[in-house]
Amino acid sequence: MKRLIVSCGMLAEELKKACAGQSVLPEIIEQPRGMHEHPKELKERLSVLISEHQNVDEIVLTYGLCGYGTVGLISENTRLVLPRFDDCISQLLYRETEGRTCRSKIQAGHLYLTGGWIKDKKSVLGQCREITETYGENAPEILDAIYGGYHTVDVIDTGAHNIEETEKNAEEICRYLPLKKEKITGSCDILKRIISGDYDDNFIVLNPGDAVTEQMFRFNGR
């Protein structure tokens, strides 16, 4: 079977880790990081890529719901596969050793960092620095308006990045924001299944011509 994987650049290191030890690898096309912030553009980009690669048997996206950026996608002549998660953070928080009991383990009031997210142009630390440089003594008030609802910054350790670098980033964030820092264990389990093609209930597998819907991402009806 000829397979194509279209992946978010935010997951580059995790995908590389998932590929380790695999004797046969599918073709992988990496997309720019940060597309989740522009769902309409993401959908347009993915639609074009899907249309341009109808010569394969299966197209697999590492994108989940991503702000509804994948809803409506159709692959006319190939199977289309997506992880049944709202976003990449939800994917990385999932661990097969624990199983899945809810739609997402993301908690209200928590900011999540990975090695990929701290490299984003609009990272939390990048915004804190920019706002402070731009607004000076008024910066704390602006930062509170944006991040006042958060109390914890969680560093996700997937084993794919230099965790010390990510923790240092989190510590710098805590200099700007009154947050406590925690380190939590994530995984590349979903990406490993994407690479191997060994899908379970955490994946949406569509036949040619079927469209992605929001309902497909629900867990136990929610």
Language model segments and positions:
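Short, well-structured alpha-helical segments in soluble
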Residues: E44-N55
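Long, charge-dense
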Residues: T78-S123
